[in-house]
Amino acid sequence: MADALPLLLRAYRALATLVAPLAHHTTKTKITDQGIDCKRLRERKGIATQPRPKGELMWFHAASVGESLSSLRLINALAAADPARTFLITSGTATSAHILAKRLPPRCTHQFAPLDSPLYVRRFLNHWQPDEAVFIESELWPNMILETRARGIPLALLNARISDKTAASWSRVPRTARALLSTFRLIHCQDTRTAVHFQALGAAHAAVGPNL
């Protein structure tokens, strides 16, 4: 997989591997200071603290509180339509974990997202083996996306948003932008401006979708 990647992505993958232990140490302080059980710190290394449920599993990745709540609305609708489906939601903040703990519907599990190291992401995917992956808004971690795609797991980006400044930055590395955005089979944007930005970055299939 790495041989076909733009140089910038290959460099990022190598750097992420090197700095992952330091990033985990930094995260440890933030999470434990906000009342999270220290046993859950291993989730940031991709080590699960819950078993994978049987059957089809849909994974939602959300950055923080707002994205997590948006995910829950969609999960509730999908769960009502398909009683056999199970769900996993990942997020990166202690606040989102506390809120989700009070609001998780049946058949839904929360874990902290693995830090964006190839090793940590592979551990995570080895355990959870999701059948589909849904990323919410703007949380696009390259290794998480690339490792998921490498396993043939369909990816969707919903409620996508991107600022003018971020779009301009991505436009300076067009091969990298295309390499990441092309992994998504479905990209639904919050508004026309965002859809135009994504299309200009190489995601011709990006379109305005329902706002979560």
Task: Mark where each language-model region is.
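Active-site and donor-binding regions of nucleotide-sugar-utilizing enzymes
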Residues: H24-L212
